[in-house]
Amino acid sequence: MRVKGSGRNYQHLWRWGTMLLGILMICSAAEQLWVTVYYGVPVWKEATTTLFCASDAKAYDTEVHNIWATHACVPTDPNPQEVVLGNVTENFNMWKNNMVEQMHEDIISLWDQSLKPCVKLTPLCVTLNCTNLRNDTSTNATNTTSSNRGKMEGGEMTNCSFNITTSIRSKVQKEYALFYKLDVVPIDNTSYTLINCNTSVITQACPKVSFEPIPIHYCARWFAILNCNNKKFNGTGPCTNVSTVQCTHGIRPVVSTHLLLNGSLAEEEVVLRSENFTDNAKTIIVQLKEAVEINCTRPNNNTTRSIHIGPGRAFYATGDIIGDIRQAHCNISRAKWNNTLKQIVIKLRDQFENKTIIFNRSSGGDPEIVMHSFNCGGEFFYCNSTQLFSSTWNGTEGSNNTGGNDTITLPCRIKEIINMWQEVGKAMYAPPIKGQVKCSSNITGLLLTRDGGNSKNGSKNENTEIFRPGGGDMRDNWRSELYKYKVVKIEPLGVAPTKAKRRVVQREKRAVGTIGAMFLGFLGAAGSTMGATSMTLTVQARLLLSGIVQQQNNLLRAIEAQQHLLQLTVWGIKQLQARVLAVERYLRDQQLLGIWGCSGKLICTTTVPWNTSWSNKSLDKIWGNMTWMEWEREIDNYTSLIYTLIEESQNQQEKNEQELLELDKWASLWNWFNITNWLWYIKIFIMIVGGLVGLRIVFTVLSIVNRVRQGYSPLSFQTRLPSQRGPDRPEGIEEEGGERDRDRSGRLVDGFLAIIWVDXRSLCLFSYHRLRDLLLIVTRIVELLGRRGWEALKYWWNLLQYWSQELRNSAVSFVNATAIAVAEGTDRVIELLQRAFRAILHIPTRIRQGLERALQ
């Protein structure tokens, strides 16, 4: 009995422990998180896109056509919006900025496009008979008392004569023109030819074409341009003060070398920027804090003449010079320039360990590299910048080797045949400008190169650094203005875990081969069934949009190839590309939202459970401590997988809804008696009965064949066979003589319909008996389960009452014990306090008693 009781107690404890463990598991189970889609989140990624221009072209001279074609740009925004991005740190790299490459290609394309309709000077590639033009040959001198200072050196200009074929091919006409010495190449003592005739096709700039740099704002649609506002930003690395703009500031496309003109200034101090300061092959871009004014002039009062070189073609040349032939020059304030060099030297010494800084002239090369080249009023100046870069700085004070007065005068030469962008095969002839030419510009930056070499071999002093003016790569000019910008693409779609789940039609998910269908082409599912194709609608929609995009790209390429026929400028192509790309990106996002069942929603819940392998951070940490950019970087590797799961979930949901709608036709009881449904019932019934009869015939034939093989012959169909008794009525034994006569025998029926009737009756009886037995079994099981369940519930209720009573008794006992312990402790404390108090009160008595004993 004791053992049995122990077993029962153990069984009760086991049940109770199992129940408690289940309760603990339910209570401690982690709450399920679900993927939620957000549209419009502030997330971006680095991108390269087509930029277009904005400009105030109408604010400039409308009589001329500027070579930058800014008339095709959109107007600038009178109230540009700039949004400061708080708590954002973004990495910039001015040396890996696609905006620079794009601007460089745009400027080259603009120059090429502006020269396409202009006159080719191929007829001038003939032998020229030239003589040096001297000052004493000038006519109508207006200032005969002027000093020789500033006069052009002898041989700087030449008077050349040449033969030109007239409109009548058999006749040759002799013409003359004045050329600068830099534009002709001597063949012998008196014979010359134009400098680029042997290597390039020279194109004359069209009349009324202006080279004046007009500010161009680069803009992006459906993209964002990030702007770094750090005042000392060196062009690379993280930037903590970031804002977003729709367009850049106005950038003047000034084509110059050595000096950067009319650009932006540094806000606090001079800033040096280089991809690698230790690599002497890398250009150093200097951004000044204060601009230095440079005033340039061509004092010659030139006249121009037109020479016809063919039908509808004219060559514009310098006809004569009124007054003295004076040299072009530029003036710069010596004090301002020295102060600028002083600020640059301070930064260079900080960068190169307080070494002695030496500025020297260019080391040689093409005229564009050796001299400071730029455009002034339509004339291309080539100025000797040796006086600007000829000083040594041992500290904050420098020694200038040139000395002189308060103004630095740079002698300049003029070229009319320009080797465009230092590219082989392209040259331009800039027609001369009438009258005098003057221009004023601001020097806002420098382009420097550092001498290399090994100091141990004596190539240079190890305590000095030599810097020379550089340039030639116009990318550095654009980079000096675009250093603080970068283009990013906006990714408005974001996914994050939440506790919310989409309420959907619950149905078991079918294993349909959608993965294989993902790799089918747009028309690859044409031969599949409609049911299989319905699961690939997502793929088809995506491929359809891709086809539209591809067609648009093909259209753009065709337009770009035929822009000379359509008369589209480079900016027109850029705007078309930018607008189409913006529409494409918007359609792509809307397409994804539609595929996910989130059209028109900013917050869209899904039925995709969140996988902790994507990110195991808690909701509080995600939504309370992380930005969308940080979160996007956290799950960037799983974004495509999450998108795929959302698509599959939505496909299953749509399939479930379709099947639910198909079940709606059974919602009304009257639909059950529809004639169409009854025909369907009859068809199914006939198929079942026919199948059963066929099986009966097959088995009968097989039985006959089997008996024949065993040596029996088939019985007559008129023979009566004894019917089988039930299991509760066994056949009689031999002693029960007359019992067997009572066995009933069934006669084999005649005819096919009779056989069908007997088989159908037997089938119905068999089905009835089996269903009745199954119903009885189910009833017994339900009854048993109900009784056992009721007993279990009563047991759990009694167990709950028992343990609640035990807990109540334990709590009462604990409170009583605590109260008793507190009471006893309180009594002891009070007793101790009383003893201490009495001891203090008896101190005088004890003192008096002690004194009395001492005195006795």
Curated annotation (Swiss-Prot):
Region annotation V1: where it falls in the sequence: 130-159
Domain remarks in the Swiss-Prot or TrEMBL record: Some of the most genetically diverse regions of the viral genome are present in Env. They are called variable regions 1 through 5 (V1 through V5). Coreceptor usage of gp120 is determined mainly by the primary structure of the third variable region (V3) in the outer domain of gp120. The sequence of V3 determines which coreceptor, CCR5 and/or CXCR4 (corresponding to R5/macrophage, X4/T cell and R5X4/T cell and macrophage tropism), is used to trigger the fusion potential of the Env complex, and hence which cells the virus can infect. Binding to CCR5 involves a region adjacent in addition to V3. The membrane proximal external region (MPER) present in gp41 is a tryptophan-rich region recognized by the antibodies 2F5, Z13, and 4E10. MPER seems to play a role in fusion.
Coiled-coil features, chain-numbered ranges: 633-667
Residues annotated as site: Cleavage: R510, A511
Region entry Fusion peptide, spans: 511-532
Region (MPER): 662-683
Glycan-carrying positions: 87, 129, 135, 140, 143, 159, 163, 189, 198, 234, 241, 262, 276, 295, 301-302, 331, 338, 354, 360, 384, 394, 400, 405, 442, 457, 611, 616, 625, 637, 674
GO biological process, one term: positive regulation of plasma membrane raft polarization
Annotated spans, Immunosuppression: 574-592
UniProt name for this protein: Envelope glycoprotein gp160
Record motif YXXL motif, residues: 712-715
Region (CD4-binding loop): 362-372
PTM description: Highly glycosylated by host. The high number of glycan on the protein is reffered to as 'glycan shield' because it contributes to hide protein sequence from adaptive immune system.
Organism: Human immunodeficiency virus type 1 group M subtype B (isolate SC)
